[in-house]
């Protein structure tokens, strides 16, 4: 089956993002296809390059990035939600005259169209 995941919880403070990542790995281990992960609302914090957990804590942001590099899973974050929360890429930083970007490599700023496309092309969309 072809799946998409929507994450609405931040990297730290709730179980939503870590549960979504565990679910993603379970899907891939069982031979399913994971087309994309869409980060919405507080979920956009999963793409913050500046997140720096303690050395004895799990680095969820880099774990998402690893999912992207190892399995080619698209990591889309809602551009409107990201901008409201200070998550920006180089293009937006330039457009808004901000000193730097903080979007973790592997993540892409996307509109809700990416989520709509996933819901049309996947067998299941699972929200965390």
UniProtKB/Swiss-Prot annotation:
It is found in: Cytoplasm. The keyword tRNA processing applies. The active site is at 78 (cysteine persulfide intermediate). One of its GO terms (biological process) is tRNA wobble position uridine thiolation. One of its GO terms (molecular function) is sulfur carrier activity. Its EC number is 2.8.1.-. One of its GO terms (cellular component) is cytosol. Keywords: Cytoplasm, Transferase, tRNA processing. It holds the Pfam family DsrE. It is an enzyme of class 2 (transferase). The keyword DNA-binding does not apply. Belongs to the DsrE/TusD family. Heterohexamer, formed by a dimer of trimers. The hexameric TusBCD complex contains 2 copies each of TusB, TusC and TusD. The TusBCD complex interacts with TusE. Part of a sulfur-relay system required for 2-thiolation of 5-methylaminomethyl-2-thiouridine (mnm(5)s(2)U) at tRNA wobble positions. Accepts sulfur from TusA and transfers it in turn to TusE. This is Sulfurtransferase TusD. It comes from Salmonella typhimurium (strain LT2 / SGSC1412 / ATCC 700720). The lineage of its organism: Bacteria, Pseudomonadati, Pseudomonadota, Gammaproteobacteria, Enterobacterales. The gene is tusD.
